[in-house]
Amino acid sequence: MLTCFKAYDIRGKLGEELNEDIAWRIGRAYGEFLKPKTIVLGGDVRLTSETLKLALAKGLQDAGVDVLDIGMSGTEEIYFATFHLGVDGGIEVTASHNPMDYNGMKLVREGARPISGDTGLRDVQRLAEANDFPPVDETKRGRYQQINLRDAYVDHLFGYINVKNLTPLKLVINSGNGAAGPVVDAIEARFKALGAPVELIKVHNTPDGNFPNGIPNPLLPECRDDTRNAVIKHGADMGIAFDGDFDRCFLFDEKGQFIEGYYIVGLLAEAFLEKNPGAKIIHDPRLSWNTVDVVTAAGTPVMSKTGHAFIKERMRKEDAIYGGEMSAHHYFRDFAYCDTGMIPWLLVAELVCLKGKTLGELVRDRMAAFPASGEINSKLAHPVEAINRVEQHFSRDAGGGSHRWHQHDLCRLAALTCASSNTEPVVRLNVESRGDVPLMEEKTKLILELLNK
């Protein structure tokens, strides 16, 4: 059994869970199951990504698949390459923000559609585990070619903004020594070539699989100091930080204050609806009051289950122009409904210039109107029992109602879920209120006490 196969992707500890042999088997299984003619491959900066990618390529070639290798890349560059070239699929070797001794893969088929549990991943897993493939036919073996799509990708990114709208901006960008660095360099060069008055202050921009400044995961408060400090030191207008494969971007205002992804969803939704009144916007259920309030004014909010596969599927079904999750995943119809970490900050930078306001000013009223706890993770030995304690407490208060308490619309437990981390279960808590910070903080504190009782 291959334990590296998860619900939506492949992730495992290097060695027993994921190695070159397993990578070859995954490539062979992908080829045998989908029978693609050509697919694109890429890999992040991790020290094992290149060898795993080449083993994956060999498996694909042995299955008769032509492989186009775009080199070191972010996950969204694989999405872009897949739909831009019109090939049959793509695979990115990445462990994103997982620990150093992990790696993984994200798989898509034609049109950059995700391959997850119920859309082919279990089939690939079954074939890889069986490891019973027909002999390699050397006359039909696939070809391998290295290609460079960076310029075409940057062209696409710049299609989302009008550079003429940009006024003088100073932006701190922290690539976290991940795969974003070369893309940031290419964007900087494009700004200069177009005469845009944008200065980029680059932090930890050099790709380094040793991650000398720690695994880049700005969702964690302890990973935000370098970006915050650089914004303050340089008097920047905004800070941007990426995770390892830059499919998420995290924003900081002009004071170095981290802006929860939840409010960026509302900000981007509002920007899209100004240009596309009546459009549909997809959001996840964890925190939603602000997003629904913004979208209802000019469009149609549509709630989706949390998770990239669900969001993308719902966006296609609804023909939604944009979708956002509070976890800093942002999805765009014109990006094949995929998530990208580069497009959001470009749009927000343009918005700051168009509105003549700072990022802090753009989100301040929304943060005051709908204060939220942000997602709080608690690693607990007995998570199910802990969640039951919370449910029982509030069902008593509500006379037997569910733990999505306080239907009086002042405050709600937006989400309380149990998820698996790499080592132990984690309970994720989100609380939001309508304009009442003390109430939100009081309920958050109470729930955390109940969880840890």
Curated annotation (Swiss-Prot):
- Give binding positions for Mg(2+): 96, 243, 245, 247
The protein's name in its UniProt record: Phosphomannomutase
Name a single GO biological process: O antigen biosynthetic process
**Purpose:** Involved in GDP-mannose biosynthesis which serves as the activated sugar nucleotide precursor for mannose residues in cell surface polysaccharides. This enzyme participates in synthesis of the LPS O7 antigen.
Return the InterPro entries for the record. Answer: A-D-PHexomutase_a/b/a-I, A-D-PHexomutase_a/b/a-I/II/III, A-D-PHexomutase_a/b/a-II, A-D-PHexomutase_a/b/a-III, A-D-PHexomutase_C_sf, A-D-PHexomutase_CS, Alpha-D-phosphohexomutase_SF
Xref: Gene3D superfamilies? Alpha-D-Glucose-1,6-Bisphosphate, subunit A, domain 3, Alpha-D-phosphohexomutase, C-terminal domain
Q: In which pathway does it act?
A: Nucleotide-sugar biosynthesis; GDP-alpha-D-mannose biosynthesis; alpha-D-mannose 1-phosphate from D-fructose 6-phosphate: step 2/2; Bacterial outer membrane biogenesis; LPS O-antigen biosynthesis
- GO molecular function annotation: magnesium ion binding; phosphomannomutase activity
**Do you know which CDD domains this protein is assigned to?**
PMM_PGM
Instruction: Give the family from UniProt.
Output: Belongs to the phosphohexose mutase family.
Task: Recite the UniProt cofactor note for this protein.
Answer: Binds 1 Mg(2+) ion per subunit.
Q: Which domain of life is it from?
A: Bacteria
